[in-house]
Amino acid sequence: MSQRELCNSVDGKVSPTAIAKYEKGLMMPSSDVLIVLSNALNMKLDYFFRPYTIDIDPSKFEFRKKSNLGSKKVESIKHLVCSEIEKYLEIEAILGITSKFCLDYSNTTVEGENEAKLLALRLRNDLNIGSDAIVSAIDLLETVGVKIIEIDHDSSFSGTCNEAVGLPVIVVNKNMCSERKRLTIFHELGHLLMHCADGVDKEKMCNVFANEVLIPSDKFKNLIGESRHDISLVELQAIQREYGISVDALMVNRAFASEVISYSKAAALLDMSVNEVRDTLNLM
């Protein structure tokens, strides 16, 4: 949100010039102005009185293009996340906890789904988990220096990522179900790790990467068998319990990609029309 947009959101009660002076510390807002600004930004009043000690660039937060977040919500989330990250890192500093992030895949360029899957398998190998189910995505990634912050927000926000003091930070909505939260964490990790070639849809590659991290394609085929032309909901639910993957478009997409089910079967499992399934699968 620009200074002028913020000014407009408070019906001109604060001028862009005044906002600029507040930001530079040249002038202090009155209590009435603080209340107006906190309401406009959806932030608590104490946010404005906390000095930042951690260098975080809010402009580097990325949000999914198809999300329903308006500019006001985006700015509110950015500032909330910066505050939460700062508190998180301050606590670690007090406790003497140090972290180092060692995963570097900058020498790999993702040009399509195959490379995204290979990168996911490389990550699994580097984390020494083979093809096993991931018990806790948060615990696993925090052991290699990834900071994961959960914030309280409505369903319009799922996740985002950034860097702070040289460490990757992933932010997720604490109110999501565990399966969606796990998928979002690895989707955002894809944004942090993956370098995509020009013209490649990074959002789609991050989905492919996240799916493959959660359950490798070969493992999925081993679980359901190589030659199948159908799959039951009971089987999908068993895989859900073991691998923490929701029985929705993710699992159906994996089964469809493995040529286990047809569009019509996917539609039946998802309670959608065939055309809706086509659209859903094309987005993943």
Name each model feature, range by range.
Residues M1-M284:
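Short juxta-domain linker segments that transition from a proline/glycine-rich
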